[in-house]
């Protein structure tokens, strides 16, 4: 049982997301457990941040959307870390849009 838990944790640790925001571009790069990498690019000026919250569970999902394209981020984070990321990213996106 411990081996199975360790193996599942090891596999999930290989999953990564990288979110890069500049004045010119927002890039989301997701590496899945299988090793497959998916990238999405957005114009930050047309991008909206969608944060779903539950009164007791906190932030349940974060999505970035622009022109009909929607990408979820941070699914693997706990609700507290999701809230922290959503706040920091929302502030960074607002700063880029003002510049």
Task: Tell where the protein language model's regions lie, with residue ranges.
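Alpha-helical transmembrane spans
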Residues: 1-15
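Membrane-cytosol interface motif
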Residues: 13-39
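Beta-strand secondary-structure signal
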Residues: 18, 27, 48, 61-63
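A short, compositionally biased
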Residues: 21-24, 56-60
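Short beta-strand or tight-loop elements
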Residues: 24, 45-47, 69
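Pleckstrin homology
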Residues: 37-59
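A membrane-cytosol interface segment of integral membrane proteins
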Residues: 59-99
């Amino acid at each position: 049982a411990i081996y199975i838990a360790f193996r599942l944790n090891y596999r999930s640790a290989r999953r990564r997301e990288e979110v890069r925001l500049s004045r010119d571009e927002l890039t989301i790069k997701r590496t899945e457990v299988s090793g497959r990498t998916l990238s999405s690019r957005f114009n930050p000026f047309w991008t909206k941040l969608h944060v779903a919250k539950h009164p007791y569970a906190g932030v349940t999902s974060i999505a970035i959307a622009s022109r009909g394209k929607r990408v979820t981020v941070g699914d693997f984070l706990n609700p507290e870390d999701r809230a922290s990321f959503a706040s920091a990213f929302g502030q960074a996106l607002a700063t880029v849009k003002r510049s």
